[in-house]
Amino acid sequence: MSDSQREQRKNEHVEIAMSQKDALVSDFDKVRFVHHSIPSIDVSQVDMTSHTTKFDLAYPIYINAMTGGSDWTKQINEKLAIVARETGIAMAVGSTHAALRNPNMIETFSIVRKTNPKGTIFSNVGADVPVDKALQAVELLDAQALQIHVNSPQELVMPEGNREFASWMSNIESIVKRVDVPVIIKEVGFGMSKETLQALYDIGVNYVDVSGRGGTNFVDIENERRSNKDMNYLSQWGQSTVESLLESTEFQDRLNIFASGGLRTPLDAVKCLALGAKAIGMSRPFLNQVEQSGITNTVDYVESFIQHMKKIMTMLDAPNIERLRQADIVMSPELISWINQRGLHLNRK
């Protein structure tokens, strides 16, 4: 594939992603908090700091991996970097493969660090990238962490996608051993199982983003790019974010669990934290906001989102993220069935 074709693909991904709509039915609606009438804390007492093994986040919310690799996506990355800088949230860039292949594309990613020199930034590569390229991806952004995206369904639906996955796990292990910053294994909207989490833990992974079904749908995106659009039947493939968090329960004391995929509201975000996530990522909401409403309105959106999360945590009598795990929750019969059929053991504190 030529560089111009790759650039076109990057733009197509963004265009199709922006046109996607939120799911009408979400597993977040199948999780409910029990309301207790009299909190013992004030909103001002809520501390939203997220403590992970290797770094802390001022807020448990970050702009998740989206884009880079074309002139248009450079502009998007710059806008999002301003939003991250002004609000104090972390930001991940999209796959840096374009920049690792073509030096002319480096600035479409490095603009993020240039715009936000003191911010927390995650770089991003695929699971098949050589170790030396993974090191370059970190250096490119002076990144605090490296996301490795695992996206086999997307690759298999993508007309020009990868068809070879046998080396992914061993390659991830090599990168984890060589890269000095934390490595976050990131799904792209298909969720993770307890078996995947066990396998990743066994090779030394400390961070995962379970990124479940319900948000940006890369099967649909790649199917739109197919000449006969013949793989739409896979559009609901994978686990939802809620199901993935339930799958992660027994690993939450051993792994730093991040969650993304289909979050619509501050309430959805708080539910993720209550189910064991240490931070939550969002992509399309930020993309749509910054492209349709501009930087200032997106900053306002983020600040409002954070304040709403604080208010919900106050209602739940949770002065910090750790205490959220003690919040009383009721789940739907469908989720209880998932728990039982999968043999999951919920050790909510």
UniProtKB/Swiss-Prot annotation:
- N-terminal signal peptide: none
Enzyme category, top tier? isomerase
The entry's FMN-binding residues are A65, M66, T67, S95, N124, K186, S211, T216, G262, L263, R264, S283, R284
Broad class of where this protein is predominantly found:
cytoplasm
Residues annotated as binding substrate are R9, K10, S95, T96, H97, Q154
Name the record gives this protein: Isopentenyl-diphosphate delta-isomerase
Keywords associated with the record: Cytoplasm, Flavoprotein, FMN, Isomerase, Isoprene biosynthesis, Magnesium, Metal-binding, NADP
A Gene Ontology biological process in which this protein takes part is: isoprenoid biosynthetic process
* UniProt xrefs under Gene3D superfamilies: Aldolase class I
